Amino acid sequence: MQTVRMTTAQALVKFLNQQYIEFDGEQQKFIKGIFTIFGHGNVVGLGQALEEDAGELEVYQGRNEQGMANAAMAFAKQKHRKQIMACTSSVGPGSANMITSAATASANNIPVLLLPGDVFATRQPDPVLQQIEQTHDLSISTNDAFRAVSKYWDRINRPEQLMTAMIQAMRVLTNPADTGAVTICLPQDVQGEAWDFPSYFFQKCVHRIERRLPTRASLADAVEMIKRKKKPVMICGGGVRYAEAAEELKQFAEAFRIPFGETQAGKSAIESSHPYNLGGIGVTGNLAANTIAKEADLVIGIGTRFTDFTTASKQLFQNEEVEFVNINISEFHANKLDALKVIADAKEALLALINELQAIEYRSSYTVEIAAAKEFWETELARLHNIRFTGQDFKPEVEGHFDDNLNEYVDALGTQLTQTAVIGEMNTLLDEDAIIVGAAGSLPGDLQRMWTSRKPNTYHMEYGYSCMGYEVAGALGAKLAEPSKEVYAMVGDGSYQMLHSELVTSLQENKKINVLLFDNSGFGCINNLQMGNGMGSFGTEFRYRNEETRKLNGAIMKIDFAASAAGYGVKTYRVTSVEQLQEALKDAKKQTVSTLIDIKVLPKTMTNGYESWWHVGVAEVSNSQSVQAAYESKVSNLQKARSY
């Protein structure tokens, strides 16, 4: 047996360079590159290996471990999970910073390889710098926290353990049914230890993603159920995009006159203008999709996890005869809602169903309902696009909260812009193939409802974990995946303040991204939630502390985000009017460096709910009558929802 004497870290780098993916007959390198933030826990081990011979891995320098790992996830998401990035951090706080990103990747079923440095396997220098000492178990380190949020976790305590660990890591990273974050912990001493690795460990390895076919029995059962139903609706989930099954879903919809709603992950698989595309569905869905869904007697989920936002906490589907068919590569997700399970690749399942249903000449009984719902929503969309602040008689979309002090925001922020009008202008002015990236706050709701996707795969929303701070890093990841397209981070001031470190990395790499920063001086989405459930405005507006009351109810804070970003070298713009917005968007396209448009918008001017409900933990006992009323409303809505 031929062997190669290498350090553990050198062997890892060599192994990663030999991993390939094959999908529908096309092969490509699976691991494009690696994000790094070096510290004592990885610099002389994995860092040395990368310096000596990184192979074809592109080595990127992150600014924050969570930020770079979010960028890695976004890269894989935009690549439809066919190519990924790895990330390495030092021990302790560096690795802990990636835990949130691991959770984000796993919640979204997006493959990311995390390589955190770890404490010494020998324990000779214990406690090493940045080590936590647990008196009940000395084998525990910070990295054990990754166990709860990783789809596969391992620790390499001996060099030879690398081989079995990485084989299992690749199994999970390339498994569409159960992929997510894979964490391989690398004790800093073991990284530098040498071993005689067998040469076959470094052979080219091609991981073929097979398209799983539906079983005859599940296919027959699905056909039997569908043919009994008159008003079915489909839900287009992220699995449609990852399986590249958009054309088959279109064929299915057109052949049998079945409309479909989109989840956040599924949106832009098919252009918004398609006659059977109702748009976003659920809590952040629009009126067209939710109206049709309420009356549907069959829900066909395709590549969806059926989250509470998609099902409106399982209260959306009100037809007493409603049943579910779940097409999913994951048995776990297919098993939800007592559904008839079709555990298969989305494309193969749809093709098989098309053949069977065409043979019996099935058609839904819809006549004008679909077109009428879409037309009604288009009218509402035009209204949202044209909302302008009109002074004292102005009624914001979210009424009854700030009606008496909205003018305070007009004066403090120096703006009269409404959020829906800004989004309308952006949708008109951005290139058709531009990619928008979002994650948290009120923007995901506005975008799922309002954004018209004119080209496939241009809507990139992380809403599985809704991780604040994903947006800017996510834009960088999407840009690395599709460097020829303009990429826009749609981010609120709350999320931007949490994390925007990789904006600097975009400058360093000459990968232009555009940050569209909506500043309403607060956590506006959560303010809506608390006030909509009977509370006052508490801890969600960005106000100075009032010296008299000692509460955060002083003057509204105004932050010059443009000035801050300009210090990095970003091209910046300040916007308080529609005309300024139009000029800024046009000029930003001409730039070669990353841009930031600081857009001051009025609170409560985002979209509100459309025929949906969200189950949250309203207080059962309170001295507040409005909270009591909110609890009674919750109980009433819960009675209309499925129990599981």
From Swiss-Prot:
Cofactor binding note: Binds 1 Mg(2+) ion per subunit. Binds 1 thiamine pyrophosphate per subunit.
E.C. code: 3.7.1.22
* Record's catalysed reaction(s): 3D-3,5/4-trihydroxycyclohexane-1,2-dione + H2O = 5-deoxy-D-glucuronate + H(+)
Which Gene Ontology BP terms does the record give?
inositol catabolic process; isoleucine biosynthetic process; L-valine biosynthetic process
Where is Mg(2+) annotated to bind? D493, N520
Query: What is the top EC class of this enzyme, as a single word?
Result: hydrolase
Q: Where is this region: Thiamine pyrophosphate binding?
A: 442-522
Keyword Metal-binding attributed:
yes
Keyword vocabulary terms for this entry: Hydrolase, Magnesium, Metal-binding, NAD, Plasmid, Thiamine pyrophosphate
Q: Which residues bind thiamine diphosphate?
A: E65
From which residue to which does any coiled coil extend? none
Q: Part of which pathway?
A: Polyol metabolism; myo-inositol degradation into acetyl-CoA; acetyl-CoA from myo-inositol: step 3/7
Q: Which cofactor does it need?
A: Mg(2+); thiamine diphosphate
GO CC terms on record? Answer: acetolactate synthase complex
Annotated GO MF terms: 3D-(3,5/4)-trihydroxycyclohexane-1,2-dione hydrolase activity; acetolactate synthase activity; flavin adenine dinucleotide binding; magnesium ion binding; thiamine pyrophosphate binding
Tell me, what does this protein do in biology?
Involved in the cleavage of the C1-C2 bond of 3D-(3,5/4)-trihydroxycyclohexane-1,2-dione (THcHDO) to yield 5-deoxy-glucuronate (5DG).
UniProt-listed NCBIfam families: myo_inos_iolD
Family, per the entry?
A: Belongs to the TPP enzyme family.
In its UniProt entry, what is this protein called? 3D-(3,5/4)-trihydroxycyclohexane-1,2-dione hydrolase 2
| The species this protein was found in | Bacillus cereus (strain ZK / E33L)
